Each structure stands twice: as C-alpha cells, then as structure tokens.
Amino acid sequence: MNQDTINAYQRNAILTASPAELTLMLYDGAIKFCNIAIIGIEKKDMEKAHVNLKKAQDIITELRVTLDRKYPVWEDFDRVYDYIYRRLVDANMHKDVSEVEDALKYIREMRDTWKEVMKAAPAGSKQPK
C-alpha cells in the first residue's frame, strides 16, 4: 500500500467513526506518541521526543475540552487529564522516560476503561465522552 492509500483509509476511518470511536482513536494516538517519545528520549533524539510529547499533550487537551459537562463524572475525568497533561509537560521539560511512563499508565487505563464502556453500551446508544 502506498502512503496516499494509507492516508485515504485513515481519513475515511476518522470521518465515519462514532464519537466513542473517535475518543478511542485519541487515546490510541496519545499512547502511540508517548511510545515514540520514549524511543526519542532513549536514543537522545530530543526533537523526536519533543514533537511526540507535544502531540500527546495536544490530544489530552482535546479530550479535556470536549468533556461533556452535563455528567457529574466530568470533573473526575478533568482531574485525571490535568494530571496526565502535567506529567507530559514535565516529561518534555526534563526528557524523563519515567514521567512519560507514568502518564502512559494513566492513558492506557483510561483507554481500557473506555473500551469497556463501548462494549457495555447498547448498539446505537449515545456514549458519554
């Protein structure tokens, strides 16, 4: 497959995804970028680490600003996202793998929980974000 085909496939996946699937994609993207940043830090490629930590920070920001505030649980999610974001910023400032891994642990937990919510929700129901 060439890059144009891959890009078209990814674009189509995003355009046809439900809000719940988009949230899952954001979690997966944050995990991917954290893993790439860890590789960058380990290989002393600070530019790679910075760029990918910034992408992960942007995803966490997007998850925070799109929280549905009509559900009381939004405040709990916001606190977790704030913690993750601060860890990513610290990791970017210090280029510290342990800080990225700490953030990654929480992102994975959030993603895994979200996958369970998606499975438990009846088909066609509106899932909270």
Where are the regions that the model predicts?
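N-terminal intrinsically disordered, cationic/polar leader segments
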Residues: 1-35, 39-43, 47-54, 58-61, ...
